[in-house]
Amino acid sequence: MAALDIHQAIARAQAEYVRCIDDGDLAQWPDFFTAECTYKVTTADNHRRGMPGAMIYAASRGMLADRVASLRDANIYERHAYRHLLGQPYVVSADGGEARSETSFVVARVMRDGSTDLFATGRYCDIYAVTDSGVKLRERIVVCDSSRIDTLLALPL
């Protein structure tokens, strides 16, 4: 896949990913990942220091599906929705069947009572599996700018 095509494929995948979350279609969220994948939400400080700690960690698409099932059926949390704003993906590298990118994000949280607040800012550090049919996330590290993370981190970022 040519460099421009990879950039466009990643930008489209990013748009579809946040639309899925923002529209509440969480059952489809694991489909953006390869079967063997990593999803991690961490702080910029932990990421910079190479610390393994994470607020959310999953090591496979099955673990992501389990998270969605628990959000739907088991966890008790105040219902809310997200609205993502994304920067353009920056393709760090692309060779063979893999592409690495970074994308800045801002997430607003909308509560049931209608109140809206700035929930998280940061960047996605991604590794994509690249095939002729498109791209899928092999690894997504969500690096939050702040070390102050709200305890209501239920939905995926």
Language-model segments: residues:
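A generic "alpha-helical surface" signal
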Residues: 8-11, 20, 55, 62, ...
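Short helix-to-loop capping/linker segments positioned immediately adjacent to catalytic or ligand/cofactor-binding
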Residues: 17-19, 72-79, 112-115
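A short glycine-rich, hydrophobically flanked beta-strand micro-motif that places a catalytic Asp/Glu
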Residues: 27-28, 84
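A beta-strand edge to alpha-helix "cap/lid" segment located at domain peripheries
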Residues: 81-85, 90-157
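Short, low-complexity N-terminal intrinsically disordered segments enriched in polar/charged residues
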Residues: 1-25, 31-35, 42
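Hydrophobic pocket/interface hotspot
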Residues: 17, 29, 64, 101, ...
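A solvent-exposed, acidic/Ser-Thr-rich amphipathic alpha-helical stretch
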Residues: 35-104
